[in-house]
Amino acid sequence: MADYNSSICCIFNIGTHYRNPIYSKMSSELPCDFYFGDRLLTPIKKMDYTQLNHFRSELHNKYLFSQFYWQSKSVRLVFKPYTYYVLDGEPYCLSSWVILFWAKLLNKKTVAWTHGWYGRESIVKKVIKKLFYSLFSELMVYGEYAISLMSKEGFDKSKMVCIANSLDYDNQLKVRSKLSPSSIYSTHFSN
């Protein structure tokens, strides 16, 4: 049972295995509780949630139509004494819209963890994303390119921060340090 001493409530669509390092670091260094969805339409390996100090609950992702889904028991979390809500920046999650609405009314801060703008959005997607992202207090996006595109769409640059991708950077450094130049590609393709 959550004691709500944490000031940050993280509600994500799922806890993927590749985000284990960043979630573990957040869990050990920040006052945050974690709530993860149970499944996606495309199966993906989940991390071991018990590794997190403040894993609170797995929420059921109920798919309604196409990619749109509702996260059961997520909306009630906005009425808990958290100060910040970190959500996937996914407009397909309909319960996130409701959380954003209530958070605004209750004067709570919301942060999107998202790819942001890709640059190939249709007019309909642009309108939906613009409305959705405008509901957040702040946006954490993966790249400067997304920030550039979103600022052209009217988003305030001061409310966006580039967090790069959430892959295991420390492990990638170790792997890259062991790599060496090879002719395997040019030899195989004769170029």
Residue ranges: model-predicted function:
Residues 1-59, 80:
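N-terminal subdomain of nucleotide-sugar transferases
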Residues 15, 89, 143-145:
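Helix N-cap/beta->alpha junction signal
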